[in-house]
């Protein structure tokens, strides 16, 4: 009998076991599509990024003009740039939905997979931040100045750390060149971590909407979920193309059309939309070090979620009180995102402080209490 190459070849076997013959729960919904969508986002960003890097010049006197040149004179340069800039937004939409799915259905109980996922999120945030600095517009420059300057709040070593990161006494040419180097490197780190993430996931197998073991009812990934994923790819790539072709600057900041000027500060310094929730939490605390700690905690709190699980059920499918809490948390994050885009004045200050307080209270206090309460109510 002829050998089946797909199942016996050392390399093809790995691909086969991850994408073709992978045993998958028969009842996973469209919410399980976002992992593969994130993979497509990463590939798209690496390809468009590579094409952009071929025409970009990492020098303060040339960076802004090299981006302008790319959009005017390079074949489809405008399209590649718009796909790359808006692809980042789509990447964050997908990762936030992916994390929300994991939170709702208790996927975080696969602790290794979850922890690698949080590290992936942090790496993605770092990549997006250094990438935003590269066009060297006003918001690029001032965003870099404000955010890197936060490290100076660290006691004793803060100032030294910031000057070391800058490569001088302010954000200047050395900062831009190292940010370009980091922005080129980090996506490949993300790709490596993704493989680790998948390795850990395939140790336990996927979770499912009921949060119960599904070993007795698994189906092959291909053709059932591969065809389902293709629908997701099509919808995502259509929305990316629509955004990039019809309103490429919708999510950008108009300040970034002005070349960086260290002598003129923009009236409202704010990051891209996907960082606004964390920025609002940072601003809600009047003390610099306190704000930095809250900013770090807003993402690092995800590491604690598996430890705070008190319910005897894995998923929230049959836990109405936790569901209410979950959607309040989602609303709270949307409020934080909106407040982060507003100027620092009344009433936004107090709204931001209340929303920040609620964010940490729900995750650290209310979820564990409600989980235990539901056990009581259901006599579990």
From Swiss-Prot:
Give the disulfide map.
Answer: none
Q: What is its main location?
A: mitochondrion
Source taxon at top rank: Eukaryota
UniProt binding sites for heme b b562 = 84, 183
Residues annotated as binding a ubiquinone: 202
The residues that the entry says bind heme b b566 are: 98, 197
Supply the Pfam families for this chain: Cytochrom_B_C, Cytochrome_B
Q: Name one GO molecular function term.
A: metal ion binding
| Membrane topology note | Multi-pass membrane protein
Transmembrane regions listed in the UniProt entry = 34-54, 78-99, 114-134, 179-199, 227-247, 289-309, 321-341, 348-368
For this chain's record, the cofactor binding note is:
Binds 2 heme b groups non-covalently.
Q: Which UniProt keywords apply?
A: Electron transport, Heme, Iron, Membrane, Metal-binding, Mitochondrion, Mitochondrion inner membrane, Respiratory chain, Transmembrane, Transmembrane helix, Transport, Ubiquinone
Function comment: Component of the ubiquinol-cytochrome c reductase complex (complex III or cytochrome b-c1 complex) that is part of the mitochondrial respiratory chain. The b-c1 complex mediates electron transfer from ubiquinol to cytochrome c. Contributes to the generation of a proton gradient across the mitochondrial membrane that is then used for ATP synthesis.
> What PANTHER family does this protein's entry cite?
CYTOCHROME B
Q: What else is known?
A: Heme 1 (or BL or b562) is low-potential and absorbs at about 562 nm, and heme 2 (or BH or b566) is high-potential and absorbs at about 566 nm.
Family per UniProt? Belongs to the cytochrome b family.
Name used for this protein in its record: Cytochrome b
Q: Which organism is it from?
A: Paradisaea minor
């Amino acid at each position: 009998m002829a050998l089946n190459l797909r199942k016996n070849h050392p390399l093809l076997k790995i691909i086969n076991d991850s994408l073709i013959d992978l045993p998958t729960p028969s009842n996973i919904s469209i919410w399980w599509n976002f992992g593969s969508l994130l993979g497509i986002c990463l590939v798209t960003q690496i390809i468009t990024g590579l094409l952009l890097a071929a025409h970009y010049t990492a020098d303060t006197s040339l960076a802004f003009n090299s981006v302008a040149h790319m959009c005017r004179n390079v074949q489809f340069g405008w399209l590649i740039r718009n796909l790359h800039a808006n692809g980042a937004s789509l990447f964050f939409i997908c990762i936030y939905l992916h994390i929300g799915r994991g939170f709702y259905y208790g996927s975080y109980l696969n602790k290794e997979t979850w922890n690698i996922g949080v590290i992936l999120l942090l790496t993605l945030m770092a990549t997006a931040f250094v990438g935003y600095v590269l066009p060297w517009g006003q918001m690029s420059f001032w965003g870099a100045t404000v955010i890197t300057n936060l490290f100076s709040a660290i006691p004793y070593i803060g100032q030294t750390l910031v000057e070391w990161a800058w490569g001088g006494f302010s954000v200047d040419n050395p900062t831009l060149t190292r940010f370009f180097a980091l922005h080129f490197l980090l996506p490949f780190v993300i790709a490596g971590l993704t493989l680790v993430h998948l390795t850990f996931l395939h140790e336990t197998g996927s979770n499912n909407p009921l949060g119960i073991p599904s070993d007795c009812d698994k189906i092959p990934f291909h053709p059932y979920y591969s065809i389902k994923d293709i629908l997701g790819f099509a919808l995502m790539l259509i929305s990316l193309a629509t955004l990039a072709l019809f309103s490429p600057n919708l999510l950008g900041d108009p300040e970034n059309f002005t070349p960086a000027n260290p002598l003129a500060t923009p009236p409202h310094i704010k990051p891209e939309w996907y960082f606004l929730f964390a920025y609002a939490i940072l601003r809600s605390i009047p003390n610099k070090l306190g704000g930095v700690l809250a900013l770090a905690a807003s993402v690092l709190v995800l590491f604690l979620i598996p430890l705070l699980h008190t319910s005897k059920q894995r998923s929230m499918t049959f836990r109405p009180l936790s569901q209410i809490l979950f959607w309040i948390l989602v609303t709270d994050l949307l409020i934080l995102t909106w407040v982060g885009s507003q100027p620092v004045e009344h009433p936004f200050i107090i709204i931001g402080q209340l929303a920040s307080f609620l964010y940490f209270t729900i995750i650290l206090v209310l979820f564990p209490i409600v989980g235990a309460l539901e056990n009581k109510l259901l006599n579990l």
